[in-house]
Amino acid sequence: MKTIQKTLGIFIILFSMLISPIQAKENSSSNWMENISGDTKLSALSIPGTHDSATQYVSLSPIFQCQDTAIKTQLENGYRYLDIRLVLKNDDLILKHNFAKCRKDKSIFSTSLTLDDVLNDIYTFLDQNPSETVIFCVKKENSKDDLNKVKSILNSKINTNSWYIENRIPTLDEARGKIILATRFKSEYGLYLNWEEQGDRTILDVPHKKEDINVSESLFVQDRFNYGVEDKVQAIEYCLENSMSNDSTFYLKFHIHEW
């Protein structure tokens, strides 16, 4: 599988079984899901993703750039989980990292990257690779934004032929060719993937937070972004050891590299 050079903030989503992309036949990073059985639940896959996925071109890039490739390229390179941070701008949604604006190109005069820009790239990718699916995890980046307005604009973009919007972990066949909506806020549509802030440096015996997706499915998250290297490795190892239990639990693990 291709790697993204000098990529910052990459995280891997580890689910309850480990079925690696390289176990699919050597066709392409663009369609590594093609030869995985369609009755496999997404919680039984190990799926790579990116953190602050839209930050290839971002204001104050030395501080806020987490990726040096576009979302289109990330998908072509095999990543299937996107971390999308949305902010209201008039009657539209744009992408930001904290207060830093994500831009369409590297020019400081470039306009803001919009939700439509990102969705168009994903639609194109899925049209070309119908065996694949993309988890689209949305966070409201500005706490002052009206959540109902954010949801209204987001929901207006949804075409049920192109999106999976149930609050239930799907099988691969249910999700192929579609965007899987996930939100970190309560919504009438999509998987509810929410967790409390985990920046505390305090070492916990069980460094994960369990949340309910629905009455029968759960989310375990390791997002200890303030841990030092040794403690972070311990947290990652714990997640690996405990992510084989069942396919009704999402295991979401953040770790950071630069290479």
Regions found by a protein language model. Name each.
Residues 155-174:
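Acidic, His- and aromatic-enriched active-site or binding-groove loops in soluble protein domains
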Residues 9-18:
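Bacterial N-terminal signal peptides
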Residues 110-157, 161:
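Catalytic cores of phosphodiester-bond-cleaving enzymes
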Residues 1-9:
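Bacterial N-terminal signal peptides that target proteins for export
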Residues 77-80, 129-135, 160, 176-178, ...:
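Loop/turn elements at helix/coil->beta-strand transitions in domains of secreted/extracellular proteins
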Residues 182-259:
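C-terminal active-site rim and adjoining tail of enzyme catalytic domains
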Residues 24-79, 88-128, 183, 187-193, ...:
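Long, acidic (Asp/Glu-rich), low-complexity accessory segments flanking structured domains
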